[in-house]
């Protein structure tokens, strides 16, 4: 909707909005007849139509007197209710003066304020809250005051609201209103009446509200939740302006933490944190938040509370460590996103004191996921495994209990869970030698249960790399041979492949099936692991006879795999084929140097990789800790050195923001000004500029219009048109401008998809006093206003996993490939630049983003407010001259978002 506001005036609030298809124009004579001679039902229907016409921009002022004469005297309650709506929506003034007819209306309202029916009284009092005409309100004040003593709470409640409205806008009509309401509050027993009265004092006479609160401070816990909520707000306001009063009210806030109302409990916790940073206060507030987290069913509430707990953890990590077991109770939520946030908090709160309890709790949760009736599914099991993985590596004393548990999930059909387990075992077996023997034995035992190629590859690599005795080595050889049994039978290779495929159709997923289906990378990994097992056996001083037998067995298996790859209908990877051939070659002709490469250098390389990850994690942590929250030249006003006149209510809050380092709003003014667009020139007779406000599904243009001439401009008409998926909801009505006057208008534009849009327009006007002709028509063509798609895109890296990214990458059909063209020379900096430009979140972990190798690949993801997903893959390398080259591929389910993001990157690629 659009509305017009002239300078110096206040836009009238719209309190009623009813959609109505006008159809035929109003029949004024017919309406008059119905009011004058119709039945009560006819009057009701006609009055409804008149109200609807008036609301929708077609007032019928000539019906005012007939309504006063023939409808207003009725005692029907429905008519009285409709009349209150009618008085509310009609124009009650003419040329700034109250219409004479409103005197008659005023008399009717006075009668209704003294009506014997409480509903009529209360409805009339409620209507007075919406009146802004002092001439109408003045004669009604005595009756409004008398209703404070009405026996019915409905009347008293609305009488308080009426006095609140009158005093707020015309305090001279009831100068003693604060004292009146204060005395009323002392005697009142009804909760809703007390709430309204307290709100009135809170906003109009804070000192009276504080006086009342001080007198009943011990009774606050027994108040209703409506009143308690306002009490909390008052305490926050009082303590902000008078810090010395904090100790007086903290006890009250502590008691309200146990309120039965979730809203009161939430506000009390927030207020307590703002009043005190003492451990007792922080612990009490955090406990209240945790109670809400565990007991509230609304997922939105849970997410908000989790954000609050994250904020507490940043400044009071020790306290959160004490409460971590209480937070874990929130894992009972069926929402997976909530569980992820809970586990993220837990990960940062693990200590030597609570690690055993946390691991025990998580083990119980993992066991629950094995039940068929469990709702959360495999993804929940994965994040539990991931949490155990990360937390147990921090405190290795629990690894002995964790490893056997996680081993059970090596054969998990859900890829992320199984991969996480085997990666965890690979890291543990290198970092903690004391656990190697246990892990190797368990790995060999569970080898045949593994169903995922990547997991099997890592598992056989770990076994070959870290096996420590001949017994385990022979056990591993037997296990691998059994897993390849069908492939090793002495038949023609084509028959082997066909029989294996036929057999696995009715069997579960197996390594044989994966190789038969063409996974030659897996075959090459098995070949290299078998080769390493042979070299490891020689290192363990195996007998010559057994050594020759083992070598023959290994070479036979590798030869079979090579022959299978040649006969397969699935094309063999060249690197995999060459890898298998090289294994045969080193087995035939090996020397000390080759054995050192296979047995020592490979392990050293992996150990260096783990050290590199630790260094990167440490560097990222230090960067976070060293982040400067407050610049040294920021000014903090000291209250004691300022005069009272110079001290404003916002100073305290602004100083507090600076003191705690919350500089997120530091550039707010700069961002606000950047959204102002100049639509016409300073030399034009009318200067126009627009401020763009972007909401979730629409855009509101705050348009400022300046008459730069000395003439009165009439029929000033602003016409807007759009390109793209934009739709103007309502036109701005024509208006008149005095010389040198400023006027503002609002236009609402609906956005239906994530696409770049353009708003264009003209502003036409007539000059007052001139003879109307085409030559007198003036028109200013406005500049184009471009709507940026980035305003509707949000990072989604917290919603995506690597597996989900890959699945969506395969599903999404629209792709936009953009060549990299930039003057940035740092690979990591370029990735962050693209993330900032497109508002996409970086899914690739920070530790994997590095300039060391000269090449970099990163995944990014985002989601629009319309639910559209967008994925991006950046593949770049640094050339010899220092420049970056490569491609950015964007994939999306809909074409528009892929195209617009590509255009954004293309336009911004050269900017650092």
Swiss-Prot record:
Note: Brefeldin A does not induce dissociation from the Golgi of the beta-COP and presumably the other coatomer subunits, but DMSO does.
Keyword vocabulary terms for this entry: Cytoplasm, Cytoplasmic vesicle, ER-Golgi transport, Golgi apparatus, Membrane, Protein transport, Repeat, Transport
One GO cellular component term noted in the UniProt record for this chain: COPI vesicle coat
Name of protein: Coatomer subunit beta
Lineage of the organism: Eukaryota, Amoebozoa, Evosea, Eumycetozoa, Dictyostelia
A Pfam entry, by short name: Coatamer_beta_C
Gene Ontology biological process terms, A to Z: endoplasmic reticulum to Golgi vesicle-mediated transport; intra-Golgi vesicle-mediated transport; intracellular protein transport
Each HEAT repeat, start to end: 59-96, 100-135, 136-172, 244-281, 300-337, 339-375, 397-434, 441-479, 550-575, 576-612
Described function: The coatomer is a cytosolic protein complex that binds to dilysine motifs and reversibly associates with Golgi non-clathrin-coated vesicles, which further mediate biosynthetic protein transport from the ER, via the Golgi up to the trans Golgi network. Coatomer complex is required for budding from Golgi membranes, and is essential for the retrograde Golgi-to-ER transport of dilysine-tagged proteins.
Coiled coil: none
